Amino acid sequence: MDYTMEPNVTMTDYYPDFFTAPCDAEFLLRGSMLYLAILYCVLFVLGLLGNSLVILVLVGCKKLRSITDIYLLNLAASDLLFVLSIPFQTHNLLDQWVFGTAMCKVVSGLYYIGFFSSMFFITLMSVDRYLAIVHAVYAIKVRTASVGTALSLTVWLAAVTATIPLMVFYQVASEDGMLQCFQFYEEQSLRWKLFTHFEINALGLLLPFAILLFCYVRILQQLRGCLNHNRTRAIKLVLTVVIVSLLFWVPFNVALFLTSLHDLHILDGCATRQRLALAIHVTEVISFTHCCVNPVIYAFIGEKFKKHLMDVFQKSCSHIFLYLGRQMPVGALERQLSSNQRSSHSSTLDDIL
């Protein structure tokens, strides 16, 4: 197909509205709002079900009382907070904001508390793995439920503290005749905008991944000389943790960092602004997906957790049959008893994430 223009005809003649109007970074996204909303709904349902199921199993099974289980429970709770903000963001995509300024700040708070606490708990779990494998003797003293609870409370406090500067700038304002909930910075507040962007980059990526890298390099060095089945599974899972976290969070942080460079006029131009706006939305959707994948990575892969999940499922089925006045099939009952016995034998083993 020939895209050559006629002589003496400019791009403005072909696209007068685009070149005469101010640079609009959002126009590229308006046609995709409905698709984004559908995707957000799918992520909400999957994230709500997955993380709720993790919490149900961890709270419902009395055998899950290790420090790892405490971190898993808090990680699922942080992802659930993140998930609860999605319906409001979906509504904000399709229609104007009708929930008021206070709710605008609350929803943004849920989003960022979920974001920061999730990254912090991933980091804390990595440090816990590092202690358990590299410093096994010392870990016996510190890897207790009370220490895990205290550290979890500290993580939540740190996440709330990191969120407060971001919440301050969220407000409801009119955009194209519609009320929207978004971060609003006056021109003299550019330094605050850059501060919040760099805060997300530093606390949401650079610091956690520096700790992750150190922990997992030391873990792999420690495990290199003893590759039995459990050790091999631990190495694979460690690599999965690092790679998946990078895949989901690095793109968004890079796009946010480049946006900061554009605000500093290091990067400039209308086309650059439009590409960055599109990149922020696309990478944000990718990062949203992480709240659905976490239950798979940190829970469903674990053999111990899968056994307890099956126990919960079988017990639920037995209660349903009992409520209906029927008995469970003999084969299912035998499988349940066998599963309980295997679970009791394996409960003394330390669970590998």
UniProtKB/Swiss-Prot annotation:
Function (record text): Receptor for the CCL1/SCY1/TCA-3 chemokine.
Disulfide bonds, paired cysteine numbers: 104-181
Keyword Membrane (UniProt): yes
Membrane topology: Multi-pass membrane protein
Segments on the Extracellular side according to the record's topology features: 1-33, 92-105, 170-200, 262-278
Name this polypeptide is given: C-C chemokine receptor type 8
Subcellular location: Cell membrane
Transmembrane segments: 34-61, 72-91, 106-127, 145-169, 201-220, 237-261, 279-302
SUPFAM superfamilies: Family A G protein-coupled receptor-like
Superkingdom assignment: Eukaryota
Species this protein is from: Mus musculus (Mouse)
PROSITE patterns tied to this protein: G_PROTEIN_RECEP_F1_1, G_PROTEIN_RECEP_F1_2
Topological domains annotated Cytoplasmic: 62-71, 128-144, 221-236, 303-353
Keywords: Cell membrane, Disulfide bond, G-protein coupled receptor, Glycoprotein, Membrane, Receptor, Transducer, Transmembrane, Transmembrane helix
Gene Ontology biological process: chemotaxis; immune response; positive regulation of cytosolic calcium ion concentration
Alphabetized InterPro entries for the sequence: CCR1-9-like (IPR050119), Chemokine_CCR8 (IPR004068), Chemokine_rcpt (IPR000355), GPCR_Rhodpsn (IPR000276), GPCR_Rhodpsn_7TM (IPR017452)
Family under the similarity heading: Belongs to the G-protein coupled receptor 1 family.
Tissue distribution of the protein: Expressed in thymus.
Residues with glycosylation annotation: 8
Family matches, as Pfam families: 7tm_1 (PF00001)
